[in-house]
Amino acid sequence: MPLTVRLVSWNVHKCTGGLDRRYDPMRTVDVLTAANPDVVLLQEVAQNGRWYRHDRQVDLIGDALSMPHRSYFVNVRFGPRRGEYGNAILSRVPITSSSNIDLTLANRKARSVLHAELRLPTARGGTRTLHLFNLHLGLGEAERREQLRRLLTSPALQAIQLRTPTVVAGDFNDVWGTLGKRILVPAGFVGPARPLRTFPAWAPVRALDSLYSRGDVEVLELVRPRSRSARTASDHLPLIADLRLLSPHA
């Protein structure tokens, strides 16, 4: 029986609406609950700020989704009022290891990729490995290119065999929709057949967010929800991907 996984990638904008600027983590939870994911890759997840009621959003969202396995790394620190934020991976299945890959360039905002290794139970009582890389790239075009090159040459990615199921997803800030094709595809990754516009959420014109896969995994479907809650909960729309892990002997 094929092993399938539903994954959501989303820049949640610190659970703050892109239009109304209202902090409402339950809107974020509602959108994610409707997607019914097995694993979630989130960017701009905040904590420790008065503006966010001192919520630790990774735990607030994880508890609401009944996802006990979590990895979180702070990228940007502001102070007592605005707190800090970073990338998070939440999962229904165990995260066996995780690490953060620093992609920050000189004189630029801190950026990174959160890497997690998951073990997915199979019908026959075994497990399959799935590697996830949750990224949030910079605003400059040259900056983004260099950050992706650093990811490709990082020890974490270099150690993964080409056939091992691997997904790179997140907020690429890819204004022109060419970044992954130019850098990830030549490295063996497969991207979406067509870019899905995700920004701004209420009237999307840019495909800033994306998902690429490599190895014994295929993307069965990649969609962006357009519900009212999805268009108001953040300034980005989420991406929902249905993945199927292929037989390692295929």
Give the residues covered by each predicted segment.
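Active-site regions of metal-assisted phosphoester/phosphodiester hydrolases
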Residues: M1-V39, R53, D63-A64, H69-A250
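Membrane-embedded segments
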Residues: N48-V58
